[in-house]
Amino acid sequence: MEELLKYIVASLVEFPEEIVIREIEGEEQNIIELRVSPKDVGKVIGKNGRIAKSLRAILTAASVKAGKNFSLEIID
């Protein structure tokens, strides 16, 4: 799951080397924390949160296949 997210986000940001993805496992769902360069936060969130919503939708679709529940948090 982390590889998929990193691949997508790396194509959006100016500083892909600063992408940090951390997965926190919980009982009912796993939380994925995404950190990017402060200059790239706006690019990952997008206008009115459109890109962030799309990333969450992709993550939800992939989580069905994996049989787990994932939640995306973008940390600035």
From Swiss-Prot:
GO process annotations (BP): cell wall organization; peptidoglycan biosynthetic process; regulation of cell shape
Which Gene3D superfamilies does the protein's record reference? 3.30.300.20
The KH domain, residue ranges: 29-76
Location relative to the cell: Cytoplasm
Pfam families named among the record's database cross-references: KH_KhpA-B
User: What is a single molecular function from GO for this protein?
Assistant: RNA binding
* SUPFAM superfamilies in alphabetical order: Prokaryotic type KH domain (KH-domain type II)
A GO term from the CC aspect: cytoplasm
Where's it mainly located? cytoplasm
Does the UniProt entry include the keyword Cell wall biogenesis/degradation? Answer: yes
Keywords, sorted A to Z: Cell shape, Cell wall biogenesis/degradation, Chaperone, Cytoplasm, RNA-binding
Subunit note: Forms a complex with KhpB.
Function statement? A probable RNA chaperone. Forms a complex with KhpB which binds to cellular RNA and controls its expression. Plays a role in peptidoglycan (PG) homeostasis and cell length regulation.
The family assignment reads: Belongs to the KhpA RNA-binding protein family.
Q: What is this protein called?
A: RNA-binding protein KhpA
